[in-house]
Amino acid sequence: MCGRARLPTDVSEIKQDLKIEWDKLGDYRPRWNAAPTSELPVVTAAQGGRTLEIMRWGLIPSWAKDPKISRTTFNARAEALDSTPAFRGAWRAGQRCLVVADGYYEWRKADKQPFAVALGNRAPMTFAGLWDTWHSPSGATINSFAVITTRPNALIAPIHDRMPVILASDCWAAWLGEVDAAEHELKAMLKPYPAERMTRWPVDKRVGNARYDGPDLFEPLREAS
């Protein structure tokens, strides 16, 4: 499960690293405690190049009658993308995206201690995601996404039984549909990221309050183990 994220603070770095052609972020601002139903930066691709845009966290299928379904669709299990009704349509349509974050938070089940998780070099993470577009009866349009999860690596296993799929740069083009890839090749990407390239540390339990949002949340909590 991945239910909290720290949003990128350096958008210019993202644009350069991911070779963004179109910036549709609007009035973007970094956040240190983004929760499901928040808006996060997402990368999609079309013939005109890669687009960096804002989407709502929690996928609303195009057929949904109520957008509240997004409260339970912020994560998508890699093993069931083509069989889970909420995600099956986006998967079959090739509506894949990259969700960009500086890191995420996870809670250790034994004592509910939260941990921050990041790449060892502190580069932005690129989560594998699916997206969809929903039209309300009144005509409003919502673009939304889910973060795909997989089994944990050795770093995450002591605190949780799932982790987000983090894609390395050599997977981006295929995942975004810029180059042809068979379904089995795409599914092979949905694996745990190497533990030796990641790091984690305990943080303040205030991160459990989605209304609290400050840079101190990502700082190590020295007295915790």
Annotate the PLM regions.
Residues 1-225:
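Short linear sequence motif anchored by a di-proline
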